[in-house]
């Protein structure tokens, strides 16, 4: 018996057995067992393995993504075909030839194609050759990697998926052709496919015909070599070590190569690998946002989310809860809220407080789409299907790529929703009306009039978000009847996958810009803490020197003002006055004076005595403060800039630290100020590049390495 259940000339006992899960619902449900984070960790592990062994039924999204992008020889992934599949593949190929020789009438073997399948021929080989010729209808423009050429990574993904389908032995193709495609992949030889021209039903006919064109040596076929060089078919075969010359297609083999969903599902696999990473990133960034915004962590309390029942929401909240649990920022914010409960609203705004409720459904959608595509890349999706065991060809429609179109539309909408949340959080972060004491635009210079910080980045974020929201519109409701109304409904799977790839790219732009802004906010909180410490110490010392003693050495009633003066320093936002702390136009000096005035008004009869008058002390207090405070503030800032701050950065005590450390230390980004030359875009570029090449994954997962997969107990 062959691995696909075929018995040459006999019955298929495997498929005749009664299944405990005949409709596959239990299998689909079982695939969602466990946490999304564990699934992402597994995907990352699979992505990094050096070998993908194809057998037809166990290919994963991560493996497709690995073959697609890890194509450099130093870090390449190799493909190996299961020898167990050879017999089944040969059985279906032999069946087609026997059927042809017996005169059996089969679609695409003895008939024409689609709406013209009423035509008949006995010249099966020539029919396959014509199939590839007329499907070579794509337009490239000039070059091999133009705006009209499918990205080579997507082509590699398509080649892998198509091999996996054909290995299952229901397609009537020789094993040697699958070996040749495998050699092309392993040698980094990538056929050039047109970007457009497929409706993914009947499969991705037009782009897949260019892979077949290379295999058959068509003169218009091109490929790209390991170093980006352009190759014709002969050169591609030589570099890949494919011996024996070009393939003369036997009956059904051309149809087997082109009549499937591999291009759409291959690109969808790449898109979903990135989408899952970005979904986890959005959870981590939301937690960091809560930290730098002095957020109230109760929004992650498990009872709230348990009562809502949705698993994506429960997991998102639990992940944020884990990062915030024990956070130094949360502890400091709690003291702040207790000291002055009216300083900020009782509840945080929706972008923070409802982030688990917002992200949860998006994670569920992305996870469901991933499972749908994994089923698709392990499916047999051409037509007709060769059932050797029952000695028949089945004429159906597995080439209809609806799972791709639907899952990609859904995933793209989820990505747009994640981007919308990021933009809402970013907008709060840079706005000093909402960000709980951070400077407007996250400016960090001594002179805010010459530093506009992330203003340009916010405009860019609005642009990204607008384009992302546009891309959220569905593709699948734009179906046109095609091929003389034979293909009157079609999935548009690859088009939707391409649009989702664009959405992923834009969400990476948003995520990288947002992460740079969060790191800026972390450093501003560090600066704030050090400068406020300097202000507090200076006010305390000046108060002791000027308010404690009277002119004759007696204790002065003004000494009782110190505690309230320090409370003013604690409550006043540092960046509201930091550029000129003694300015009478800024709130610090105004409120310090008001404390002394209020005490003087309550000083009663003592105020009439010059020696005990608090009013008489105000001038001396303010004069000395003006002489000392600006120098102390500058000294504290200089100490921080030289790496010797009085108070260390709180982020080092937080579970979110690995991501901050990566951005600052490994990528070499820095606090952005108007005093320096470096622009926000330069720093965002570094993070974006790290996201695109996968460097960001490990520090992101390190933030969650101690999470046990469950919320904190309710007690």
From Swiss-Prot:
Cross-link (5-imidazolinone (Ala-Gly)): 201-203
Covalent S-S links between cysteines: none
The keyword Lyase is annotated on this UniProt entry: yes
Any one GO molecular-function label of the UniProt entry: phenylalanine ammonia-lyase activity
Spans traversing the lipid bilayer: none
Gene3D superfamilies with a match to the protein in the record: Fumarase/aspartase (Central domain), Fumarase/aspartase (N-terminal domain), Phenylalanine ammonia-lyase 1, domain 3
Sites of 2,3-didehydroalanine (Ser) modification: 202
Pathway: Phenylpropanoid metabolism; trans-cinnamate biosynthesis; trans-cinnamate from L-phenylalanine: step 1/1
Pfam families linked to this entry: Lyase_aromatic
Expression sites (tissue/organ): Expressed in flowers, roots, leaves and stems.
E.C. code: 4.3.1.24
Keyword Cytoplasm attached: yes
PTM field: Contains an active site 4-methylidene-imidazol-5-one (MIO), which is formed autocatalytically by cyclization and dehydration of residues Ala-Ser-Gly.
Family designation: Belongs to the PAL/histidase family.
Name of protein: Phenylalanine ammonia-lyase
Species of the source: Nicotiana tabacum (Common tobacco)
Chain's gene name: TPA1
